[in-house]
A protein has these predicted regions:
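N-terminal auxiliary segments of SAM/dcSAM-dependent transferases
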Residues: 1-25, 34-35, 39, 213-214
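Conserved SAM/SAH cofactor-binding pocket of Class I
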Residues: 44-129
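General small-molecule cofactor/ligand-binding pocket signal
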Residues: 31, 111-113, 182-184
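A short glycine-rich, Lys/Arg-flanked "PGG" loop and its adjoining helix->strand segment in the class I
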Residues: 141-153
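Glycine-rich phosphate-binding "P-loop"
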Residues: 126-139
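Conserved beta-strand signature within the Rossmann-like core of class I S-adenosyl-L-methionine
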Residues: 154-161
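Conserved class I S-adenosyl-L-methionine
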Residues: 162-179
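Core SAM-dependent methyltransferase catalytic element
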Residues: 186-214
Length: 214
């Protein structure tokens, strides 16, 4: 198997490119490169999440889990300038691109870090993620099981997953794990899932959040 985008230090030769993210009132041109997720175009799942997720909170700590070169994180930062946006990934090339893209866009409220970074806060007011499905089901469950419990009591996590890559089974796993999990959007084979605490839940301690994040 060729090296995947969730490698910590991609060995692929550099092939710089760019992707445009165009939304109402917002136009971002983002630098991309080989060795990161979807370098040639804005991933359709990412686009669906951007189009269908509700507006983010104006303040607080917002998380893009598996940020890649930064499209979700930068939109969060632009839409919520009073918030701190945490862009998390294991891929150093992706993090460098996300940081450079944030600087180019003048978005000083983005922090690009690896999953084990000690500056990460203890909780989040929103999670957006196009998660790294290809790490495998067990690793994905471990990843989400470490980060979703860090949501504030009234907060939600929005995950976009292709149907043929397991969106329905992921929704069932979320429900079986004690989350209120519902589908908020579906288009062209992609599903946007919302994960919230059940009403009886109280905040639980997070698991090992140093696992793989794209």
């Amino acid at each position: 198997m060729s090296q995947q985008y969730f490698a910590g230090q991609p060995a692929a030769a550099h092939r710089p490119g760019s992707v445009h993210v165009i939304l109402p009132g917002l136009h971002l041109e983002l630098r991309t490169d080989s060795g990161v997720f979807s370098p040639g175009r804005l991933d359709p799942g990412t686009r669906l999440l951007l189009d269908k997720a509700p507006p983010p909170p104006e303040h607080g700590n917002l998380l893009d889990l598996g940020c890649g070169y930064g499209p979700l994180a930068l939109v969060l930062a632009a839409r919520s300038p009073g918030a701190c946006v945490w862009a998390v990934d294991v891929n150093r090339r992706a993090l460098d691109l996300a940081a450079a893209n944030a600087a180019t866009a003048g978005l000083a409220n983005v922090r690009c870090v690896t999953p084990g970074d000690k500056s990460l806060p203890g909780g989040f007011d929103l999670i957006w993620s196009n998660p790294p499905i290809r790490i495998g089901k067990s690793a994905l469950h471990q990843l989400l099981g470490g980060w979703l419990p860090l949501l504030a009591p009234e907060a939600a996590g929005y995950l976009v997953v292709q149907r043929n890559l397991g969106s329905d089974s992921l929704q069932r796993w979320l429900a079986d794990s004690g989350w209120t999990a519902d589908r908020v959007a579906a288009q062209a084979g992609y599903r946007v899932l919302r994960a919230r605490r059940t009403p009886a839940d109280s905040p639980a301690g997070g698991g090992d959040r140093a696992g793989a994040a794209r």
